[in-house]
Amino acid sequence: MEGLKAARAIALLTYRCEEGLFKQNEDSDDTIFAGKVGSYYRHQTSKFVKDWDAYSYLYVCDEVDSNNVGRGRGGVAKAIAQIKTDCTFICMSSDELFPPEDMRPLSELIPGSRYHQIETPYGHDGFLIETAAIAEILASAMP
């Protein structure tokens, strides 16, 4: 259980950028910042291990790590270029898992796709926090 908590804590490090952690934990009290972040990670990892076991987590990690949309399709660019539907890309400016410098070129491989970048300090977790901005983009993308 402790190993799974440690693995999840390490994964969480990539979900928020430093600025997002500071923003989330700023307030007027004198609590030590590191204590707040540690408390946040302990809380999140304790929640996580209630729903996941180590084997399920390893399986999902293996699937994510081995995913290659271009495998057997002539590469990523060829595979993506075969998409014939309207696509809307929404990227978080501080996302380190799916950074803008990777997402914009990907969107350009699909004719007629739309790319939107939301300025946020919350990294990958921005998609959970910037819901109003996402809703506005999706509303404009829906017929």
PLM feature spans:
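Short beta-strand/loop motif that positions the catalytic acidic residue
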Residues: 83, 89-91
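Flexible loop/turn segments at secondary-structure boundaries
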Residues: 66-68, 96-99, 123-126
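Catalytic active-site module of serine/aspartate enzymes centered on a nucleophile-bearing elbow/loop
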Residues: 104-105, 112-143
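Short alpha-helix in the alpha/beta-hydrolase fold that links the catalytic acid
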Residues: 72-76, 85, 96-108
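Conserved catalytic core of Hanks-type protein kinase domains
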Residues: 13, 51, 109
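Active-site nucleophile elbow and catalytic-triad environment of alpha/beta-hydrolase enzymes
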Residues: 43-44, 59-79
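Feature representing long, continuous alpha-helical segments
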Residues: 55-62, 136
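Alpha/beta-hydrolase-fold enzymes
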Residues: 1-47
